[in-house]
């Protein structure tokens, strides 16, 4: 937004603003490879990927390991010491090879966040998760970012089931997905209850939950102003898991612990229900190895979350007596070659499509506090937020000649820091991956006030 006292935006950054602000590509990895004449090679590579997803069925060890991720946001190009899907695949396969029961689960927000997700609407990310051997996942709010039809298509493309106890079709009154899924492991039945944040309405696009004419909502993510609709849906799912014979019940939720998400946080859900033994969370990007939260009956429930962007992978161990421990793993010295090849091929494709340099800058742009690394965007002013808003202002005034007085950009649509150096189209995609449309409105000063 244009205002006095804002942080300075460097004048050395020069580009064609019209090209940058409205660049958008829709091309699938498969179509790109087909155009390049290498479809056969890609198919052969995919066929060579070892299938380890049934390892939990053969494991005889009484202790059960659950590997978990959340808010990966398509960060597939992580370098050491950060993790990758190839590392996770190898970690899981290690347990399978030793005959130990293991499950690999995700708590949502995996198909959106960088150009590696938006360039094919999450198709390659699902391919990587399939190859890595994921056993179950829940939907985060960003799984809806490519539209309702695409969200449903992603569920079909996945080799693993999605669960959500509170996503309902208002036309039928029925859940869109199963609420709970049970797995046999280590002589126990382990149940996962899926939960999607009701904030999906506002943190995705409300129109995606409406009919084609956008006259009424046809989908709901149950929440309730006081949280009761959410708590009731979760409790019903827990009770169903018990009826089905679950020995251990784990919440697989995309809720978070940020107070701004109240009354729909994971802590509030635990406090208003009974029956969870543990809760694997997402949404707030919180690093939380193990927090004890008391449920409505006074029982301590283990709450855990890995942070975001594959900075950590969670490891939950369920002992023979049912005791649960958790730890966060931030490095890995193993890698699955086939999964790594799939990721590298797509990274190279995207980098080639978006690699043209369009600008340079001699300063760092940030959305996170440079001193602490904690999120600052959406909570205060950042120089990248100022720059994006100034870019919109410049576009309307200097390119379209539309006499814009004020430009605003929602902080949640600015997604990454940018180091000093060259800017490419990929950089722009990483900063603003949602493909938002810039709009011009005529309002009075009183309305703004």
Residue ranges, per PLM feature:
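Polar helix-capping/helix-linker motif
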Residues: 49, 231, 336-337
């Amino acid at each position: 937004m244009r205002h006095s006292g804002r942080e300075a935006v460097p004048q050395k950054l020069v580009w064609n603003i019209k090209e940058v602000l409205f660049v958008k590509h829709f091309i699938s990895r498969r179509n790109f490879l087909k155009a390049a004449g290498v479809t056969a090679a890609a198919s052969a590579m995919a066929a060579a990927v070892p299938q380890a997803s049934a390892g939990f069925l053969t494991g005889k060890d009484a202790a059960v390991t659950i590997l978990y991720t959340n808010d990966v946001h398509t960060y597939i190009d992580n370098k050491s010491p950060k993790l990758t899907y190839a590392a996770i695949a190898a970690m899981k396969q290690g347990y399978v090879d030793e005959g130990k029961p293991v499950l690999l689960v995700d708590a949502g927000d995996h198909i959106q966040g960088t150009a590696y997700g938006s360039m094919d609407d999450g198709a390659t990310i699902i391919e990587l998760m399939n190859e890595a051997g994921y056993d179950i996942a829940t939907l985060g709010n960003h799984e809806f970012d490519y539209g309702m039809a695409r969200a449903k298509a992603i569920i079909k493309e996945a080799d693993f089931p999605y669960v959500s106890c509170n996503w309902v079709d208002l036309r039928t009154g029925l859940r869109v997905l199963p609420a709970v899924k049970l797995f046999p492991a280590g002589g126990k039945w382990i149940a996962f209850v899926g939960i999607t944040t009701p904030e999906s309405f506002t943190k995705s696009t409300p129109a995606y939950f409406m009919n084609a004419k956008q006259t009424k909502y046809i989908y709901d993510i149950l929440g309730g102003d006081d949280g009761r609709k959410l708590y009731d849906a979760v409790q019903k799912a827990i009770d169903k898991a018990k009826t089905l014979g679950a020995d251990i019940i784990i919440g697989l939720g995309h809720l978070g612990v940020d107070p701004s998400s109240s009354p729909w946080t994971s802590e509030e859900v635990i406090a208003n229900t009974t029956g969870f033994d543990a809760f694997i969370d997402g949404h707030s990007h919180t690093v939380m190895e193990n927090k004890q939260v008391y449920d409505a009956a006074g029982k301590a429930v283990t709450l855990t979350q890995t942070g975001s962007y594959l900075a950590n992978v969670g490891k939950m161990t369920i002992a023979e007596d049912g005791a649960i421990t958790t730890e966060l793993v931030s490095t890995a010295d193993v890698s699955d070659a086939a999964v790594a090849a799939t990721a590298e091929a797509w990274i190279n494709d995207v980098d080639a499509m978006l690699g043209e340099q369009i600008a340079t800058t001699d300063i760092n742009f940030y959305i996170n506090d440079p001193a602490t690394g904690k999120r600052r965007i959406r909570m205060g002013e950042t120089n990248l937020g100022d720059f994006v808003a100034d870019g919109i202002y410049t576009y309307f005034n200097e390119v379209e000649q539309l006499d814009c007085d004020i430009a605003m950009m929602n902080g949640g649509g600015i997604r990454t820091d940018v180091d000093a150096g060259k800017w490419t189209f990929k950089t722009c995609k990483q900063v603003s991956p949602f493909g938002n449309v810039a709009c011009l409105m005529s309002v009075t000063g009183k309305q703004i006030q």
